[in-house]
Design a protein with these regions (language model features):
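Clamp-loader machinery-focused feature within the broader ASCE/P-loop NTPase space
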Residues: 1-122
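Conserved AAA+ ATPase "SRH/arginine-finger" region at the nucleotide-binding site
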Residues: 81, 160-168
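Conserved catalytic/switch belt of AAA+ P-loop NTPases
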Residues: 125-142
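Short regulatory helix/loop adjacent to the ATP-binding pocket of P-loop NTPases
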Residues: 129-130, 147-157
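Single conserved hydrophobic/aromatic residue that forms the stacking wall/gate
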Residues: 171-183
Length: 183
């Protein structure tokens, strides 16, 4: 989703995220709830760029940091997604291990967990321990389409932000392959 679409269709969600940043009141963990395609992953990446980009008009969208975040290759942004249909404890343990080492350049470290509701209970318990002792330079964005599958204690440690459904009439499909994936 393009940034302008994200701001148009998810104005309230983006306003909450950006206001926290602008007022220097970002929390350490966000739970971004919404169906697939509503922009929660794009919002998490946008906020990662906003946190890491060094330009005055952050995010600039054109510096090396912003481009690496867009291409999922930035060393300070870790992505976790289900392997098969589940996120396992080992994946969360790897995250904790990676984040136990300081950032090389003092930049914030960000992790984005796609489909967090697919974490098994062991993975959720491991993540919970990590969420309970936040590092001021670590930020989490958990995306989900069914937050009720998460432990209540995880939900309570995150700022909940709902991404509303996007009307089908507003979805522009530009690639035939994307059409096949949707249908």
């Amino acid at each position: 989703m393009k940034n302008e679409d994200l701001f148009n269709y998810q104005y309230e969600a983006m306003r909450l995220l950006i206001n926290g940043f602008d007022k220097d009141r970002m929390v350490h963990a966000y739970l971004l709830d919404g169906e697939a395609g509503t922009g929660s992953i794009d919002a998490a990446k946008y906020m990662a760029k906003k946190l890491i980009c060094k330009k005055d008009n952050a995010p600039c969208m054109s510096c090396g940091d912003c481009k690496r975040i867009d291409s999922d290759t930035h060393l300070n942004v870790l992505y976790i997604e289900p392997i098969g249909d589940m996120i396992k404890k080992e994946q969360i343990e790897n995250l904790i291990h990676e984040f136990s080492m300081s950032s090389l350049d003092g930049m914030p470290q960000i992790y984005i967990i796609k489909d967090a509701d697919k974490m098994n209970v062991a993975a959720q318990n491991s993540l919970l321990k990590f969420l309970e002792e936040p590092n001021p330079n670590h930020f989490a964005f958990l995306t989900t389409s069914n937050y009720k599958k998460l432990l209540d204690t995880i939900v309570s440690r995150c700022q909940f932000i709902h991404f509303k459904p996007i009307p089908l009439s507003l979805i522009h499909i530009s690639e035939p392959t994307r059409l096949r994936r949707i249908s």
